[in-house]
A protein has these predicted regions:
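Positively charged, low-complexity, intrinsically disordered RNA-binding extensions
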Residues: 161-256
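Short, Lys/Arg-enriched N-terminal segments with co-localized hydrophobic residues
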Residues: 1-10
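N-terminal cationic and glycine-rich segments that engage phosphates or anionic surfaces
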Residues: 11-106, 110-126, 131-135, 140, ...
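Conserved small/polar residues in nucleotide/adenosyl-binding loops
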Residues: 257-266
């Protein structure tokens, strides 16, 4: 087990929790958007599996995600009740778009929409504005692995690291990594709920817990114009109401360091 922790290659070359915190800060600036995203996921989960979390693992996972994003319990409960009383009217469908950003950066966009044509046009426009383009299904998905990912903030975790690792591994986790600011647990998508619930039962607070697409390799951008264009694509996609999640293989930490190195003193 120790060998897993010590020898696992950090796929991004930097702390993933730093990336998570960066995303969370952006979401905090637009908390309404995040709550809308989670609200849709609650509605779909209730429609597919019912309103009782005890009998609906997908709903349990969404509730855990909601709590990790500081959604109030009463808001979660209202969302479940609303979805349960209006299940027949819920007509969201999951749509995935794949494409390329500047310098061939791979991008995957997951959306929940009640109008495919509207969403497709909006997503295509987001790519175009940043100099990218939407590709065909499967054009970049092979560059990612679908995994359950659980991030635990060290400041919020009192459990001994070895005990935490054993709890995760015994529950079925594939991998455990001790990062600078956090612990990262990786699972097979089918084992995600079991591992998350085992950690939850052990009293572990999770900063993030979701099934995600993890890049097999990351790509650096050091050209200022390419960095700006990539940010345009991501920001516009984040602002779209139908977009649930954006995945990419851009190593943002290197690009941020590059931009900071080229800023003049008055910009700092």
């Amino acid at each position: 087990i120790k060998k897993i922790t010590e020898e696992r290659i950090n796929m991004s070359g930097h702390s993933k929790f730093a990336n998570i915190k960066h995303k969370k800060e952006k979401n905090d600036a637009a908390k309404g958007k995040m709550f809308t995203i989670i609200g849709k996921e609650i509605a779909v989960a209730v429609k597919e599996g019912g309103a009782d979390p005890n009998n609906n693992s997908k709903l349990r996972d969404v509730i855990a995600k909601a709590k990790a994003n500081n959604m109030p319990n009463d808001t979660i409960e209202r969302g479940i009740k609303k979805a349960a009383g209006n299940a027949s009217a819920i007509n969201y469908e999951t749509v995935r778009y794949e494409g390329y950003g500047p310098n061939g950066i791979a991008i995957i966009v997951d959306a929940l929409t009640d109008n495919r044509n509207r969403t497709a046009a909006n997503v295509r426009n987001c790519f175009t504005k940043g100099g990218g383009n939407v590709g065909t299904q499967g054009c970049v998905a092979y560059m990612f692995d679908e995994k359950g990912q659980i991030i635990i903030d060290k400041e919020e975790c009192d459990m001994d690291p070895d005990e935490l690792m054993m709890t995760a591994i015994d529950a079925g986790a594939e991998d455990f990594q001790d990062e600078e600011d956090s612990y990262e647990v990786i699972t097979d998508p089918n084992e995600f709920s079991v591992v998350r619930e085992a950690l939850e039962a052990a009293g572990v607070a999770m900063a993030q817990a979701e099934v995600t697409m993890i890049p097999q390799n990351y790509v650096e951008l050091t050209d200022d114009e390419a960095i700006k264009k990539m940010n345009i694509i991501i920001d516009r996609l984040d602002e779209d109401e139908d977009v649930q999640q954006v995945y990419h293989n851009w190593d943002e930490s290197v690009s941020y360091t590059h931009l900071r190195a080229h800023e003049t003193p008055e910009h700092l």
